[in-house]
From Swiss-Prot:
NCBIfam families: PRK00290.1. Signal peptide: none annotated. It comes from Xenopus laevis (African clawed frog). CDD domains: ASKHA_NBD_HSP70_HSPA1. Pfam families: HSP70. GO terms for biological process: chaperone cofactor-dependent protein refolding; protein refolding. Keywords: ATP-binding, Nucleotide-binding, Stress response. This is Heat shock 70 kDa protein. Belongs to the heat shock protein 70 family. One of its GO terms (molecular function) is protein folding chaperone. Residues 622-647 are annotated as: Disordered. One of its GO terms (cellular component) is plasma membrane.
Length: 647
């Protein structure tokens, strides 16, 4: 079937959602069954049915307590989050806590039901999926969904879960401003490097991202935003203003009447839009409360005054993003407006003044740009080879830390999670026993302290290392992730030039994205155990290193004559005793290793001090050399030689 390769891009917005598809070399933004290219992110429950989109929003005044919107302001948040608590005051529907998670409570077909925000969002996503299917004429399962750039892990994971609940295979979650930048970049077809600032102010969220776009490569330099700022907040200010006016004029408080408030909010939203093109808007609501008609007006100046702090607040993230990107405002080539709220003249003026009167770029449709970019990214991920997208590259991040196993089964991280890819990191390691002929390089991904708790990606042997005492050979290990997320690991022994490498692709052996998120969540739960284990291994390695270093130092030719045979024998025997104790106590507690270390220091320190005063070449080993020390490989499971980290 020729249709299997189609994937859609969905902008799941706070107030409106939008879906697009890339086919025949261009993006189509798909209109819904009402002929609208954006669909309200509303779900309503009635005595007989569930309504989604326009149908839900159209009946909101008659059924305010069972019409749910703003799920995006709840998703991935805790019930006691101050943001949620603040929003509760404005919502006509009821939100309750279910083990700390917010749930929306409604009446549906005469019964009380409660839904998680993910479930509400999944209903909106289902509507977008059906809109695309009606247009394309076949089922759609693959999708790219967008989220605000500063959405945290739980918000992203919850959004992804919503996609799964809607029966979608989420190819990727991408950031809204980045998606908008793709729309801008394709639209412009610009050549040469450009620093672009995306200013995305929507219905409920605000993002600022700075990207460098160069010949189809979109690299995010910095992002900032406000998790809770958008058109809804401007509506709230206007609603509060008119509630006060109604009180003054009619001596009645409509604040507790959900239906009246909802009708007023709808009128305020309409007035706000009118004020973007006119200097005054009128509000006429028949029988708003207790039979009283409410006829009034608001000027643009008054609206701007009501929201002045919110409007000014949009500039802080702009400044922060510029600082993080290490760019001056004069180095930004284009300031691109995205999101319906950027139509507000005052917002535009503040931004323009901040950039010293520069023209703002309004070339892309602010309501559709994000879905447009998501559709392009969906096509790329499905392997679309159209000439205008085949060279397009979005620089993503590595979702999990990558590293290798060092002495004692410790996970030594070379690439931290959330590092932009492509990236390359090199670190030096050494052997852990004398004349060791080879090392086993084992590559892991995960957030745990010990490799046994992480995911083994692959391993290879670097052999042919020239005979040398432990700690002498220098083995350089390089982790290199390319833009496809393909990891190449190479190792080279510096003196002999011997090298070997392995390629690890993001394929069947890797964890699914679900596992990734699960691991990150688990990692926090296990963090305490991890820390204790890391300290235990550090103490063991420190003791072993100290004992070996002392032993080899007193046996050194250069020390002959500077130390009596008796002292030499004392140190040598004590070190041998400790090394033998270590071999039999691989799994001792941190405190036992610390005790052994103190005991060893007590015996050796006076002799070392004497030696010091006599002046000794090469210095004296330190007490706790941290992670530069060797240890036996963890017992069981792992044959093959180990390697250890060098500071």
């Amino acid at each position: 079937m020729a249709t299997k390769g189609v994937a859609v891009g969905i902008d799941l917005g706070t107030t409106y959602s939008c879906v697009g598809v890339f086919q025949h070399g261009k993006v189509e933004i798909i209109a819904n069954d009402q002929g609208n290219r954006t669909t309200p992110s509303y779900v309503a429950f009635t005595d007989t049915e569930r309504l989604i989109g326009d149908a839900a929003k159209n009946q909101v005044a008659m059924n305010p307590q069972n019409t749910v919107f703003d799920a995006k302001r709840l998703i991935g948040r805790k019930f006691n989050d101050p943001v949620v608590q603040c929003d509760l005051k404005h919502w006509p529907f009821q939100v309750v806590s279910d083990e700390g998670k917010p749930k929306v409570k409604v009446e549906y077909k005469g019964e009380e039901k409660s839904f998680f925000p993910e479930e509400i969002s999944s209903m909106v996503l289902t509507k977008m999926k059906e809109t695309a299917e009606a247009y394309l004429g076949h089922p759609v399962t693959n999708a790219v969904i967008t989220v605000p750039a500063y959405f945290n892990d739980s918000q992203r994971q919850a959004t992804k879960d919503a996609g799964v609940l809607a029966g979608l295979n989420i190819l990727r979650i991408i950031n809204e401003p980045t998606a908008a930048a793709i729309a801008y970049g394709l639209d412009k077809g610009a050549r040469g490097e450009q620093n672009v600032l995306i200013f995305d102010l929507g219905g409920g969220t605000f993002d600022v991202s700075i990207l460098t776009i160069d010949d189809g490569i979109f690299e995010v330099k910095a992002t900032a935003g406000d998790t809770h700022l958008g058109g809804e907040d401007f509506d709230n200010r206007m609603v509060n203003h008119f509630v006060e006016e109604f009180k003054r004029k009619h001596k009645k408080d409509i604040g507790q009447n959900k239906r009246a408030l909802r009708r007023l909010r709808t009128a305020c939203d309409r007035a706000k839009r009118t004020l973007s093109s006119s200097s005054q808007a009128s509000i006429e609501i028949d029988s708003l409360f207790e039979g009283i008609d409410f006829y009034t007006a608001i000027t643009r100046a008054r609206f701007e005054e009501l929201c002045s702090d919110l409007f000014r607040g949009t500039l802080e993230p702009v400044e922060k993003a510029l600082r993080d990107a290490k760019l001056d405002k004069s180095q930004i080539h284009e300031i691109v407006l995205v999101g319906g709220s950027t139509r507000i003249p005052k917002v535009q003026k503040l931004l323009q003044d901040f950039f010293n009167g520069r023209e703002l770029n309004k070339s892309i449709n602010p309501d559709e740009a994000v879905a447009y970019g998501a559709a392009v990214q969906a096509a790329i991920l499905m392997g679309d080879k159209s000439e205008n997208v085949q060279d397009l590259l979005l620089l993503d991040v590595a979702p999990l830390s990558l590293g290798l196993e060092t002495a004692g089964g410790v996970m030594t991280v070379l690439i931290k999670r959330n590092t932009t890819i492509p990236t390359k990191q090199t670190q030096s390691f050494t052997t852990y026993s004398d004349n060791q002929p080879g090392v086993l390089i084992q590559v892991f991904e995960g957030e745990r302290a010990m490799t046994k708790d992480n995911n083994l990606l692959g391993k290879f042997e670097l052999s042919g290392i020239p005979p040398a005492p432990r700690g002498v050979p220098q083995i350089e290990v390089t982790f290199d992730i390319d833009a496809n997320g393909i990891l190449n690991v190479s190792a080279v022994e510096k003196s002999s030039g011997k090298q070997n490498k392995i390629t690890i692709t993001n394929d069947k052996g890797r964890l699914s994205k679900e596992d990734i998120e699960k691991m990150v969540q688990e990692a926090e739960k296990y963090k305490a155990d991890d820390d204790a284990q890391r300290e235990r291994v550090d103490a063991k390695n420190a003791l072993e290193s100290y004992a070996f270093n002392l032993k080899s130092m007193v046996e050194d030719e250069n020390v002959k004559g500077k130390i009596s045979d008796e002292d030499k024998r004392t140190i040598s025997e004590k070190c041998t005793q400790v090394i033998s104790w270590l071999e039999n106590n691989q799994l001792a507690e941190k405190e036992e290793y610390a005790f052994q270390q103190k005991d060893l220091e007590k015996v050796c320190q006076p002799i070392i001090t004497k030696l010091y005063q006599g002046g000794v070449p090469g210095g004296v080993p330190g007490g706790m050399p941290g992670s530069s020390c060797g240890a036996q490989a963890r017992q069981g499971g792992n044959s093959g030689p180990t390697i250890e980290e060098v500071d």
